[in-house]
Amino acid sequence: GYVTSEDLPILYTLEGHGEKEMDSTIKEDIEKANMDIQSLNLLTEGSVPDDADCLFIDSPSTDISEDEKTAIIDYLENGGKAMIFSDYTTEDLPNFDAVLENYGVQREAGIVFEGDNQHYAMQMPYYLVPTINSTDASSETVSGGYYVLVPYAQGIKKMDDVRDTVTINSILTTSDQAYSKTDLNSDTLEKEDGDEAGPFDLGVSITETLDDDKETQIVYYSTSNLMESQVNQMVSGGNEKLIIESLKWMTDTEDSATVSIPSKSLSVSYLTLTDYDAAFWKICTIGLIPGFFLVVGVAVWMKRRKA
């Protein structure tokens, strides 16, 4: 449930470009965290509404128009906030990419694979378990000891030539053994010539300090699969925790002193095992533990024989 003292912060979700529909569980969790979700068609509206507390862009599968790009950048350059997700696509998205590049980040070509088995799960090197860095948008997730699971992500590249008023912080980072596979029709999952070497950011927070005490804030994650409820359950709610914390960092306005009462989730929590952990427990269950009982059994038998 939730308690409010003022109007709720409004989260406008961009529509009209084949965006993913928000997972119903995460939508419910955002509403429980005291945010009002409205849809936004920039083609008809022309600009981001004045009452927007945050713009939510969920992985457009076709590009935004030149006018929409201008409207989004205008909103952000006036101290706007945005949470942005993208997914790997063979489509060119020059206007969408221009919004990201205006704030110093680019999408790497390909999908990130992890070479370190402590950083991927379920024997799938593209189900990434990145390091969560402590930032204003992620510190509670870190201190709570959560993991996040990030499937099919692209690398995020920080550009060298960005305004000095822009600060980019890494939220999610792969190991330095990660690589980005550009040829997804390849016969191998191993690193090949032409694959970009890591480490890579998979999530960043971006701030830009403006003249009139305003601050632009953006959180960008390079896969919308972060929001899938099945993926979230595998890490006992870690993904949801991070997304909600990122949104709260941006929408924490002084004039909406809201109190959220987290509801207990009845969904199943899975044991989060990286591939390294899984291999260790496999050795224990197949070898060490049965071996221990065998030794004990032999000792008992020897004792009885002597008796």
Language model regions located:
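Short, surface-exposed patches at the edges or C-terminal ends of soluble domains, predominantly
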Residues: 1-307
